[in-house]
């Protein structure tokens, strides 16, 4: 992984950390941030060639993937991300935390749907 990619990850993580840097954050959103931060500390990253992603049988088409640009999609994004945790309480705290997201052009959120169900979520940046 090159420096530019690592810097993009750092910027994304700083942006996510600052979501609850407000005057009166909720106890739940702060707990959600702590849970999310612990996960980041255990996270490892690897570069995946774009061609590897495109060569796989594609489950979603471009028409199935939506830019998160209003609150309901933010909630769906948060719920999908929370499913990375097995503990129900942690999932609830992650939803509370991530629904605080203030949309930014630097980090775009996407939600993918299959047969009317939200099945994928991503944070995308152009580094």
What are these regions (language model features)?
Residues 106-122:
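Conserved beta-hairpin
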């Amino acid at each position: 992984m090159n420096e530019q990619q690592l810097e993009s990850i750092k910027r994304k993580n700083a942006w996510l950390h600052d979501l609850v840097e407000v005057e009166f954050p909720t106890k739940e959103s702060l707990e959600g941030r702590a849970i999310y931060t612990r996960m980041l500390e255990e996270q490892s990253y690897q570069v995946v060639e774009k061609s590897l992603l495109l060569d796989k049988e594609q489950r979603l088409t471009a028409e199935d993937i939506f830019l998160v640009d209003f609150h309901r999609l933010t909630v769906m994004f948060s719920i999908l991300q929370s499913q990375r945790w097995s503990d129900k309480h942690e999932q609830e705290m992650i939803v509370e935390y991530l629904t605080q997201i203030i949309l930014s052009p630097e980090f775009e959120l996407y939600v993918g749907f299959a047969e009317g169900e939200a099945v994928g979520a991503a944070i995308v940046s152009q580094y």
